[in-house]
Each structure stands twice: as structure tokens, then as C-alpha cells.
Amino acid sequence: MLGKDYMLAIILVNCDDDLWGDHSLEVEAGLPPGWRKIHDAAGTYYWHVPSGSTQWQRPTWELGDAEDPGTGTEGIWGLRPPKGRSFSSLESSLDRSNSLSWYGGESYIQSMEPGAKCFAVRSLGWVEVPEEDLAPGKSSIAVNNCIQQLAQTRSRSQPPDGAWGEGQNMLMILKKDAMSLVNPLDHSLIHCQPLVHIRVWGVGSSKGRDRDFAFVASDKDSCMLKCHVFCCDVPAKAIASALHGLCAQILSERVEVSGDASCCSPDPISPEDLPRQVELLDAVSQAAQKYEALYMGTLPVTKAMGMDVLNEAIGTLTARGDRNAWVPTMLSVSDSLMTAHPIQAEASTEEEPLWQCPVRLVTFIGVGRDPHTFGLIADLGRQSFQCAAFWCQPHAGGLSEAVQAACMVQYQKCLVASAARGKAWGAQARARLRLKRTSSMDSPGGPLPLPLLKGGVGGAGATPRKRGVFSFLDAFRLKPSLLHMP
């Protein structure tokens, strides 16, 4: 986002009109310092020159304002606002500060329901996104490109037909199962987006774009996928984390409802029916993604996670032998399993895989110091960890995003299994309580046996599954995109 001083320089350089003799700019008596009354085709409004804010209402004096309007601001009072700008009742809600200091803000926040979260944002507009760009491995790049495109061109491009909110300051409210965008002045609703209809959301990954937030959703009128981009007054990771928490809550509630209604509905809950808990990726695809890569090998490591551990292992594998000794492989990544077959033997189904790892065992992934290298750490059980590394062309970003998406699917499955287990445990406890109430003290009937939990794997595999996936998500939730260089 361009700073106010830089924007002021652009206005001064690119404006050829007489800035000092414009009769549309009136210095009206009684206005607070820095305010100008303006008449143009849009009507009559008031412009605060130092901050660039505009509003239809006449500004009022505040305690501490100087009595002489010309004091300290006379040198810039002759400036006009940027040409071609239109003003509407919604666009009058521009920033007066970098925080939520809008009129009635504190009382409005206090009136919201418990658990709701507020963020001050400015809409940068939207860009259409093709469906194929939301596939795992592509969505991160697509969303980041949308953020960069709107961030770089918003000052000189016109909003597309049907765009809502471009250039406006808004209040983004996250509560229950919806994201609401509200006018910060009159608290009117601008847009309401159900969370379950959001396909992807993300945070800007380029330098200086950490306050840019974007989400992709289908427009109900045009039936196209739109990536909406916002600039936030706080690091956008806070919005992404809040969305993740709300989606986890929705997931848990739906699992409970499904458990209560299991006797009435034979259909199990499907991951397609759940909100997509993603950051810069779509984590619900069940189809395997395939990538060509050079298999560098595996190496035991001492810790389950850490970029330093991963970089050290990749460095050791890189220095161990010649690049010509690395095996060209076709790496297949699904929501449950990663498999590497030699390319010459990939067509043969009977050939043993060169390397294989269940996604549930992954504890850490990352791109190495060389952007061509990708590594992951797997939990083999009994405090034993192993790093596997691959060399990718043109870079390891696509493979990293695909594995990241697979881990998110496993995380969803763990949440579903955990909620279902808690529901079964509660049902058994209630049944045991009813039995105690209806049986005599000397009843020969013993306590009800607890059901055995059966998951995708049994025995010793259950513990690494939870430890691997949840430890990976703990690290993933607190870090930026894994496409970042260490």
C-alpha cells in the first residue's frame, strides 16, 4: 500500500492544473484545521487534506484543535483530491487513524455477540479466478498473484462492473458461520459471506504484503469465482487464524449434530460438506497429484520439526553424492499416502516403490535453502524420526503445497475422529448411568464394555498419527506459507 506522503507526491507531480486558484476548494469559516469544503460533480463534501479523508457531513471541532485554521497546514491547503474519484455514501468511510477509532466503534464492538472478532480493512477489489487455479499446488500462487495485482494497480484502475467495496474502509466481523463487511460509520451491512462457501483464503506472501488478506468464493449472481483482496490495519495472519478457529468450531458442531441424528440418517458426514480450513490452498481434493522429482534419499534426524533440522539434513544429502546419482522419480501425493516410483518403472504396478510414507506420519515439511529442494520429516515411532528430500524443477513450491494440502486433509480427519470418539464416550457414560439407576445393588450385570476405537491404522500407528499431524499443524498455524525461504 502506498504511503500518504508518496500519494501526495504523485498528486503534485501528475496534476497540471492550477492547484492554488481552484474555486471549487473553499476555506469555509468555522471548519477545523486541515478541512476544506469542496464542490464538484459529485456534490458538496468535506476533505481533510493531511490524511486524505473525505465525508459528506460537516466536520466538528474537537478538544485540542487550533483556533486558527491556517496554523501549520497553510502550505498544503490548496491541494485537491485525486482526479476521477467518485464519492458515495459508503465511500465516505475513509481512515481517520490506523485503528478502529470510527464513530461509535467501541459501543458497537461491545454490542456484538460473544466470540465475534473485528478487523479494520480496506477493500482493494476482486479478480476472477479460474477453477483450475484452485487445485492443490496452484491455489497459493493464484491467490498471491491476485493480491499483488490489486495492490499494484488499484490506484490507477477502475473497479470491474458489479464490484462492491473497492477503495472503501470496512469493518470485517467474523462470527459464528459468516464473515460480515460493515460500513464503519453507520454500521450498515455491505456484504455477508458464509464461511462454508469460501473456497480458499490466504495472506500475502511477498515482502511488504503481510497485511493483505484474500479469500476466494463463488459469486451468486455471476456464478464466477472471485478473489476478494483487503488491506488490514493489523497483520493479516490474525484474520487467517480467526477463520481457522471458526471453521474448526463449525466442523466440531457438525460432527456432533451428525452423531445425534445418526439413527435417523444413514449418510455419514462428508469432508465435502465441511468448511475448508485452508491457508492459500484447497485441502479437500481426494485425487492424487503427481510430480517429477529427483529422489535425494533419506536420513535419520534427531527432532520431529524445525527448519534448522530440515536444512541440515538436506545439506547432508546434497553433499553426500553426485547429483547424477539421484533417482528420477514420479512422486504421487494423495490425502493419505506419498509414494515415489522410479520413472522408468512407474508404469509397472508390481514394482516396489522407491520410497513411501503415510501422510499421517508427517511432522514437518519445508523448502530448503535452495528453492529446488523439498524435505519432510516423518515420525517412525519410539522417538525415531526420518527426513526425506527431493530435488524439483523449476522449484519445489508445487510439491510443497500438495503435501501441505494432504496434511490439512489428515487434520480434518483427526478432528472428525476426535469429535466422534468424544460423542461415543459420552453415550457410553450416559448408558452406564441409566444402567446403575435401573439395576439393583446386587445385579449380576457388570459395567458396559467400552468400544474399541478403530481408525485407519491400529496398534502403534494411532499415536504417531495424532502426534504427527497435530504437531505439523501446530507449526503450520504459526508460520507463513511454506513457500517462504528459510
Swiss-Prot record:
Keywords: Cytoplasm, Nucleus, Repeat. The keyword Nucleus applies. It is found in: Cytoplasm; Nucleus. This is Amyloid-beta A4 precursor protein-binding family B member 3. The keyword Cytoplasm applies. The gene is APBB3. GO terms for molecular function: amyloid-beta binding; low-density lipoprotein particle receptor binding; molecular adaptor activity. It comes from the Eukaryota. Signal peptide: none annotated. One of its GO terms (biological process) is regulation of DNA-templated transcription. Gene3D superfamilies: 2.20.70.10, Pleckstrin-homology domain (PH domain)/Phosphotyrosine-binding domain (PTB). Residues 113-280, 285-440 form the PID domain. Expressed in various tissues, highest expression in brain. Interacts with APP (via intracellular domain). Interacts with APLP1 and APLP2 (via intracellular domain). Residues 29-61 form the WW domain. It comes from Homo sapiens (Human). InterPro entries: APBB1/2/3, PH-like_dom_sf, PTB/PI_dom, WW_dom, WW_dom_sf. GO terms for cellular component: actin cytoskeleton; cytoplasm; cytosol; intracellular membrane-bounded organelle; membrane; nuclear body; nucleus. May modulate the internalization of amyloid-beta precursor protein.
